[in-house]
Amino acid sequence: HGDASIKDALVQLGQKDLLIDCQGNWGNILTGDEAAAGRYIEARLSKFASEVVFNKKTTEWMLSYDGRKEEPVTLPIKFPLLLAQGSDGIAVGLASKILPHNFVELINACIAHLEGREFQLYPDFPTGGMADVSRYNDGLRGGAVKVRAKISKIDKRTLAITEIPYTTTTESIKDSIIKANDKGKIKIRKVDDNTADKVEIIIQVSPDESSDKTIDALYAFTDCEVSISPNACVIWEEKPHFLGVSEILRRSAEHTKWLLGRELEIRLGELNEAWHAASLERIFIENKLYQLIEGCKSREEAYAAVDKGLEPFKKRLRREVTLSDVQR
């Protein structure tokens, strides 16, 4: 696929404002404007990502395609990132659509799971809007989420759309409104898209039309209302599985526990090694073991002399004394 797919994936991650600090034109998820070319944008891990997403010591590595470098098999993420970001893709015979969820609600759900309490998860969309999640079905196949734009009245003849449904853009909303008007489904005089950092689509209603009826028609005949069908399919232990979002979160929380335990084990090992080295150095100096090597004629003889001199103190240590310890 070349590097285009890498750039597209990076832009999707950056636009969700969680893992990446972005510099340059990264596009706009509200208007659908694309990001600038890869050479014009810059990225770095956010503070959150540096703490939660990457740890060189707990990462499983594999050789790169040419065998000259190493690359991670997976990243040891201590957070249900898949549920926070959402995912949408297809493969041969498989499709997956995982909706994004609220950051704080995911944290609270993880805490509830670890405390043995029940929890429920529902999607939360970066574009806003109002959602009917009564048929969410835990994100599994067969469920559906109905999402509506937020439409308010400015005056009797003016409507404003300030939030849009997930999977739409202000451009697609505007186009659908114009098409509905051309077909006679709604009656408007003008529609303007003034969106920048926030959604703002202004609709001028025809003088002979009720604004309430126009709002109903917008939901019925335009992209102001869409239905999204989730289909949570994930790769678990190298095989595809259809799992509900609650089960995905449980497994993520348990994996995070394992990763934190692994980090503590590694840190404990490092501290034990530091204590071992400091203890050997102290024994060597305080007991003047360096005097044992003064008459030695070879390096091997000196190593043996030091090892023998350490013999009375080995019971105090937490592990055996190795040749590398003596050489140090």
What does each of the following model-derived ranges do?
Residues I29, S50-K78:
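P-loop NTPase nucleotide-binding/switch module
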Residues H1-D17:
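Extended, well-ordered alpha-helical scaffold/bundle regions in very large, multi-domain proteins
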Residues C22-I29, T195-D197:
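Short, conserved phosphate-binding/catalytic loop or strand-edge motifs used
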Residues H1-I6, A37, I41, E71, ...:
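Secondary-structure capping and boundary motifs in well-ordered enzyme cores
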Residues H1, N28-E34, D66-G67, L94-I98:
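Conserved short loop/turn motifs at secondary-structure junctions
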